[in-house]
Amino acid sequence: GMKTSEAKRLEFRRNLETGTFMIAPGIYDALSAKIAEVSGLNCLAMGGYAISATRLGQPDVGLLSLTEMRESLKQICEATDIPVIGDGDTGYGNALNVIRTENEYERAGGSCIFFEDQKWPKRCGHMEGKQVIPAEIHVQKIRAACDARIDKNTVIMARTDTRAINGVDDAIRRGHLYADAGAEILFIEALRDREEVERLAREFEGTGTYLFANMIEGGKTPIIPASELKEMGYAGVFWSCASLYLVAKTLKDAFTELARDGTSDAFLSRMIDFSEFNHFIGLDRYRELEKRYAADDKSQP
C-alpha cells in the first residue's frame, strides 16, 4: 500500500462518522488483503481464526503469540491501502500486556484494535466452553488500551464473549461499561438470533457508541445482509471466516481432481491465469522500476 497508517486511521474514523457501512472480511495474509482491495471492500479484519489455520494449521484456541499475530498484521497492512482492524485477542495477558499489544499493533499499521473479555487461553467466539473474566478487569484493559495509543485516531473496539455464558443482559451491561472505559466500538460476539442482533442496536442507539456484528457461516448467529444490519444501526460487519472457508473448499476440490487426473484440466476454468495474475500482483510496476534503475553495464569491472 501507498497510504500512511495515519491516513488509513482517518479514513476508518471518517467511515464511522459518516455512517459509511464497513464490510470487513477476515484476512490472513498479504495476498488475501490485496484481493479484497481490488474487489471494492472498504475495510479488512485480521482474523485470528484464519491466521491460526493458515500459519499453524491449528484451530483458534489461543496458540498464536503476540509476535506472530503482529507479524501477520504488519504484512496485511503493508499490502493494502484499506483500513485494517487488528484482532488483539485478550491482549495476551493483563492490562500491561494489553498496552504492549496495542502499541505493537499500532506500529504494525492497524486502524482499529479489538480486545475481548475471554479467559486465556481463548477460543473462537462460536466454539463451546468459553469463559470470561470479570467485567471490572476488562474495563481496566480497555482503559489501558485507550491510554496506550500513540496516535489518538486509532480506534479501540471492545469485544465481549459473555452472551454464551451469562446471557444477553450481561452482554449489554458489559457493553456499556466498556464504552464508558473508552471503547468507541462494541462487538458483542455470538448473538443467537435476529431479535438479539436488533435488540443490541436499540440498546446502544443514540449513545454515540458504534457497533460491529460478526457473521460466521455455520456459527451461532444467523446470517444477516449488510443492508439490513446498516438499517438496524450497525456501523460494520465482520465476515471472519468466509475467505478461509472459501479457499479451503476451492483447494480441496482442485487438489482432489489433481490427484485423480494428474492434470489441472478439470479446474483450469476456475483459475486466474499467468498473465492476469502477474498484472494483478503488480509485476508491471517492477518492470518499470527495473528500466528506471538499470545501469549501463558496458564498463569493465
Task: Please describe what each predicted stretch is.
Residues 3-235, 239, 246-256, 293-296:
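Alpha/beta enzyme core
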Residues 3-5, 12, 244-301:
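Extended, intrinsically disordered, low-complexity segments
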